[in-house]
Amino acid sequence: MNVNVINHPLVRHKLTLMREADCSTYKFRTLAIELARLMAYEASRDFEIEKYLIDGWCGQIEGDRIKGKTLTVVPILRAGLGMLDGVLDLIPTAKISVVGLQRDEETLKPVSYFEKFVDSMDERPALIIDPMLATGGSMVATIDLLKAKGCKNIKALVLVAAPEGVKAVNDAHPDVTIYTAALDSHLNENGYIIPGLGDAGDKIFGTR
């Protein structure tokens, strides 16, 4: 499976705090931002760099910068917005694209009700953010939309993933790497990740 479980002590610690049944909206929201920041560091580890000259205090010196077009971060509405600030803390120059999906009542498959992409998508790396990778339907649909725009360098950043969701993404898009804080046990009969986080969107927005 093309999945990278970020096994960092701080990531594991913060994720456990989010799993607590009495985790407040404020605490859950804050931890989602902190985790996204830590995980984005790992997801950006292989960014390509290039050399260039700068004027330093002692004269001209050679330095490094990220090569190519600026990253676009792609939150899946609505829960993905809860991770956005964490990624932007680390990469404040990132451009933001947004995808909103809902389930078709007849086919039960996710369909887009809103999408807004930045320019030059075919030249930018894209980082999709969503707290939960459950069945994988929304993630696969979002990747489909990005590839239709010509995007070739795509990664997914999720807090918790189920094996079923990882398999769905790997089967449909084996070139996309998934970064997650935990690969959990399974989905229950209602499609919730076990042990998971519950409804991450409700917890982030305080609508539970």
Curated annotation (Swiss-Prot):
Catalyzes the conversion of uracil and 5-phospho-alpha-D-ribose 1-diphosphate (PRPP) to UMP and diphosphate. Keywords: Allosteric enzyme, Glycosyltransferase, GTP-binding, Magnesium, Nucleotide-binding, Transferase. This is Uracil phosphoribosyltransferase. The lineage of its organism: Bacteria, Pseudomonadati, Pseudomonadota, Betaproteobacteria, Neisseriales. Allosterically activated by GTP. InterPro entries: PRibTrfase_dom (IPR000836), PRTase-like (IPR029057), Upp_B (IPR034332), UPRTase/APRTase (IPR050054), Ura_phspho_trans (IPR005765). Pathway: Pyrimidine metabolism; UMP biosynthesis via salvage pathway; UMP from uracil: step 1/1. 5-phospho-alpha-D-ribose 1-diphosphate binds at residues 78, 103, 130-138, 199. The gene is upp. PANTHER family: ADENINE PHOSPHORIBOSYLTRANSFERASE, URACIL PHOSPHORIBOSYLTRANSFERASE, CHLOROPLASTIC. GO terms for biological process: UMP salvage; uracil salvage. Signal peptide: none annotated. SUPFAM superfamilies: PRTase-like. Its EC number is 2.4.2.9. One of its GO terms (molecular function) is GTP binding. Binds 1 Mg(2+) ion per subunit. The magnesium is bound as Mg-PRPP. It is an enzyme of class 2 (transferase). Belongs to the UPRTase family.
